[in-house]
Design a protein with these regions (language model features):
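Residue-level detector of conserved, function-critical positions
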Residues: 2-220
Length: 220
């Protein structure tokens, strides 16, 4: 009579260990695949809200300086004359100094947010001021008037030359933005604030038809 195989307890425990090991290995594989899939998925773009910085003239203790839109002092008030901000979005400021009220003379220069001089190759750098019928004052935002060897030209706020210093004067067409009257050899002409010639220097006088430059000009 044959006898049945006797139960081997150690072999049973070994089989259980193998099953557990297989399960653990399977779970590790699943975790690895899940991590891999997550890494392969495109990351959601995070958008940061950026607040545009703006600059303004500031008057404190009878001195002029510059502050930013957060109220921080950019240039400590130290100037007797107002520091002009042609374009509030650009850190280019015009300061007036060595003013002689008796003789009506003064000097101007451009500085940056560190109060360092810009465009120093020119004898004078000015913002171009204009006004309307209600005496509201504004400045051309995209250009500056520069002087060299007693002649005037235009640059943009990065220093790029828009018009060479070949003109006896460059003045705004009063009440009209983006329109500047140039004088060369005693004749009037018209350019835009980007330096584009609109009317050649061939006339005694130039006036606007309306308060919108698109509506045309009268030349004499």
């Amino acid at each position: 009579m044959s006898r049945g195989k006797r139960y081997n307890g150690s072999e049973h425990k070994l089989n259980i260990k193998k099953v557990i090991a297989v399960i653990i290995a399977f779970l590790v594989i699943i975790m690895f695949v899940a991590v891999f899939i997550k890494l392969m998925q495109p990351k959601a773009e995070t958008t940061e809200k950026k607040v545009a910085m703006a600059y303004y003239s500031a008057f404190t203790n009878n001195k002029w300086g510059i502050i930013d839109s957060s109220g921080n002092t950019v240039i400590t008030p130290s100037y007797d004359e107002m520091v002009v901000v042609p374009n509030k979005d650009k850190a280019v400021f015009i300061v007036t100094y060595d003013v002689d009220y008796t003789n009506g003379t003064y000097k101007t220069k451009a500085v940056n947010e560190k109060n360092e001089q810009l465009f120093s190759t020119y004898d004078q750098v000015e913002a171009i001021q204009n006004y309307d019928q209600q005496n509201n004052i504004w400045y051309e935002k995209s250009c500056l008037r520069v002087k060299k060897d007693n002649k005037y030209g235009l640059i943009d706020l990065s220093g790029k030359v828009l018009l060479d210093c070949n003109y006896e004067s460059i003045e705004p067409l009063i009440g009209i933005s983006n329109s500047l009257i140039t004088t060369k050899d005693g004749k009037k002409g018209l350019v835009s604030s980007t330096g584009s010639v609109i009317i050649d220097n061939e006339y005694a006088d130039i006036k606007s038809l309306t308060n919108e430059y698109e509506n045309g000009y009268i030349v004499k």
